[in-house]
Amino acid sequence: EYIALDIQRYAPHPFRDIYLHIECASANLGLIWLQQIAPARVDDYVCRIFQQLWRDHVDISDLSVITEQLQQILGEAEFAPTHWHDFVQSSGSDALDKAYDKASELGVTYAPTFFLGEEPFQGRAQLPLISARLNAGI
């Protein structure tokens, strides 16, 4: 199938199921929490979670997997397990709902969605256009 072959071109490892349906709430909670306490570490987190899911076939819906990744990214000195667990048990759910509502308001219905200003571009096929527009200063 063309889509599978096209996606595989971008990956340095074989994929098993490109149509994998996974609950991402735990991973998203980790992202929101990390954005609040250590925004400089967000890129590392996103890369690790993608590798865990697509390369290593780890269940990222498991909160313990996300907790372990946060511990590794932040290190023992920076990771505050009580703060993380409090976030998950209390304000995290509200923060996640707000993020989902904001995405819906912005018209995000597809991943990935990129924004240049307020204009959305959906799908990696848009990357050449986005790059050209950025290079042209548009």
Language-model-detected regions and their locations in the chain:
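Structural alpha/beta surface segment adjacent to cysteine/selenocysteine redox centers
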Residues: 1-56
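C-terminal cap of thioredoxin/glutaredoxin-like
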Residues: 48-138
